Amino acid sequence: MDFIIDAIVEWLKGLLVDGIMGNLDGLFDNVNQSVGEIATQVGTTPADWNAGVFSMIRQISETAILPIAGVILTFVMTYELIQMLIERNNLHEVDTWMFFKWVFKTFVAVMILTNTFNIVLAVFDVSQHVIQQSAGIIQNGTEITPDVLHSLRTELEAMELGPLFGLWLQSFLIQLTMIALNIVIFVIVYGRMIEIYLLTSLAPIPFATVPNRETGHMGQNYFRSLFAVGFQGLLILVCVAIYAVLIQSIATDGDPIRAIWGCVGYTVLLCFTLFKTGSLAKSIFGCH
């Protein structure tokens, strides 16, 4: 009778070990996929990320927003001329060079406005160049080698039925948690790119305010926002690099319980730091 019970226990232990190994293997596979997507997404320019969306945003900017920006620029330059005249003792000391200065400023402002999209893309090209140069530094991965999986299976097979069942429940629940965390990572990374497109679509309006001292703060803050969201990708890449180093230490650890909880803990930490990259980048560049 005892050998029947022992056989049933061994059969249940085999099922639980297979289930735990399947959950653990899939758990790290999801982590690898998410980390790989982050590194790929932040290293992509707005034009390459989605050609259809990029074309639509450019058409909206040039056909709907640019005419409004032209009207705003007209008012700004008219106000600038009035200010220049008033500053010279209420028209009592008017020099012809003032008008040449105003014409030159207007010419430069019009040139900037007509090349708004190229200037915006140049900002992101600079940030993407920095990101791509930094991407080669990340050499660590989170892949589990067959030797590590074999050692984990050996440890699991030596455990009793009760701890195995508890570990299987933990691995199952944590796998569901990791799916939710992967969704959060997706939202953060894709949300950044959507924010880039939204900033790009309205670019002509803040560009039109740059020539005047009183309204120029709007354009200056817009420039800071462009650099902030561009270099946010570098901060995201740094977070992924730190995460890859941390996760590698638990991926090669022989303790299955620690590997599971360590993985979910570091992934929660990654999500938290990814959320902070946006505000950190804006504080660094002084935009609000």
Feature map (PLM): residue ranges:
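Gly/Ser-rich, low-complexity
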Residues: M1-I72, R88-W97, F107-T177, G216-N221, ...
